[in-house]
Amino acid sequence: MSRKVTLTVPVDIVVRDRDVHVLALVKKRSGASSHGVSASIRSFADELDVSLDTVRRALASCEEAGYLTVRANRMKNGGQLENTYCVTKSGDGLIEAARRAGLIS
């Protein structure tokens, strides 16, 4: 007979500093909302004082690693709106680990 169990296993992972900061900003902006935050890449770049490409790379890296989901938003006429970014449970875990390590406040 098999049963499902949940195990928490400490694993060392390597993440870029920029990824952690961008992920933490998404979490901060979304607050308690489980729906995430709709924001422009430029607004993230301005707040973190980094380039647009740096934010794009960080968002893509976080999405690929499963720390973040990205949903494209469109107007009725097909025009592009700001994407919606939502931090996943594993992203929350990464943010907490970064806080404990003193990387972010």
Task: Report residues per predicted region.
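Assembly/interface hotspot detector across virion components, adhesins/toxins, and nucleic-acid enzymes
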Residues: 68, 72-73, 102-104
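Short, amphipathic alpha-helical interaction segments positioned at domain boundaries
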Residues: 89-105
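Short recognition helix of helix-turn-helix/winged-helix DNA-binding domains
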Residues: 1-47, 54, 60-69, 76-82, ...
